[in-house]
Amino acid sequence: AALTIREKSDASIIIAEKANIKRSGCLAAGVNAINAYIVEGRKPEDYVEYAKKDADDIVREDLLLTMSERLNEVTAKMEKLGLVILKDENGRYVARGNRNIKINGENIKPILADAVNSLENVIVINRLNITDYIVKDNTILGAVGFNIDTGEAYEIRAKKVLCATGGAAGLYKPNNPGFSRHKMWYPPFNTGAGFAMGINAGAEMTTFEMRFIALRCKDTIAPTGTIAQGVGAKQVNSLGEVYENRYGLTTSQRVYGTVRENIEGRGPCYLRTEGISSEQDESLKKAYLNMAPSQTLKWIESGKNPSEQNVEIEGTEPYIVGGHTASGYWVDTNRRTTINGLYAAGDVAGGCPQK
C-alpha cells in the first residue's frame, strides 16, 4: 500500500508493524506460487466464478471482480521489484493450474520491505502493536499502540488509516500439542486484533461465522496444493481408493471428504505420490523450500522421497481469515469501511475470498 500511495501522492506515510515487515505475518517464510493470477486464456470473470463456487456463493461479486481485474498488474509490480517468476522456454510464465503461476518466493517479504525502506517520507515502526483506533463522530483520527519490547505508548494521528493486520488464529485447539502448538497453518501471532479494533470502534463487519479449515500435510502443516497441482496427486484413503470425487473438489469438500473417510474407518488419507518420477521428487522438495521447508526436511529425515511414500493429509483447526472466506470488515469496492477514513485490506477485509 505504501508503494502505491507513494506513486500517486506525496503524503506522509507511517507503517506500524507488530513484528518486523521483513518477516512478519502471512508468507513470512515465503511462498512458491502466486495463487491468484489470471493466466493466459482466462479473464477476471473466470476467477470470480471460481471463487463463488468454492465459497458456495457466499461472496460479494463486486469485490471479487475489482480484485481480479488488478491481480496481474500487482504481480507485474512484484516482478519489477525483484520477485523471480518462473518462465518456460518461450518466456511465458509457468502456470500451475488455471489460476496460479510458479515463483521462487522465499524472499517475497524481504523484497517488499526493501522497496518500502527505500521510499522517501515513509516511516516504518517495527515492534509496535496497535491496539485501538482513535475515532470521533464515526471518522478515523488515528490509532494507539505499544512497543512490544519496552511497553512505550504511541499515539499516531492520521487522516486515513489502512488496517491490514491479518485474520485470527488460536481460536480452536491446534492439531499439534505441547511445544508444537504453534506448528499451524495460519500465523499464530495473527490474533484478530484488527477485527477487535473495528468492532470496538463500531465498524460494520460481516460473515464471521464462515471459518476456514485448511487441508494440509500431516505434522508439517505444509500446503497440499503444491503436490495436488504440481504432480497431479489424487486424494486416496488407506484402501487405495480415490475418494475426492465422491465428495466434490471445492476447498471445503476436499477437507470434509478427508474427515468423513477417517470417521468411517477408511483413514488415514493421503495424496498419492508413490510412483512419480525422480524429477518430480526434486521439484517438490525444491518447491517446499520456498514456503514450508519442514516438509522437505521430513522427506530427507525419513530417507524416503515422495515417489516412495504417499503424503498423509489432514484438516487444520478453523480460522477466521478473510483471504479464504468472506469474513471481516464490510467494505465498498474502494475497500472503505463504514468508518470514514478507515480502509481494510487482506485477511481483515470481508466479502472477498480467494485473495
Describe each model-derived feature in a short phrase:
Residues 72, 79-131, 139, 207-355:
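Mobile, glycine/GP-rich and aromatic-enriched active-site lid/loop segments adjacent to catalytic centers
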Residues 33-36, 59, 180-183, 220, ...:
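Short beta-alpha connecting loops at secondary-structure transitions
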Residues 35-67:
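Glycine-rich active-site loop/strand segments that organize a redox cofactor
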Residues 27, 173-178, 353-355:
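Short acidic, glycine/proline-rich loop/turn micro-motifs
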Residues 19, 149, 158-160, 164-169, ...:
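Glycine-/small-residue-rich beta->alpha transition segments that form the dinucleotide
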Residues 163-222:
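Glycine-rich loop(s) and the adjacent beta-strand/alpha-helix scaffold that form part
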Residues 149-160, 337-341:
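Core beta-strand elements of the Rossmann-like FAD/NAD(P) dinucleotide-binding domain
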Residues 6-31, 41:
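Glycine-rich FAD pyrophosphate-binding loop
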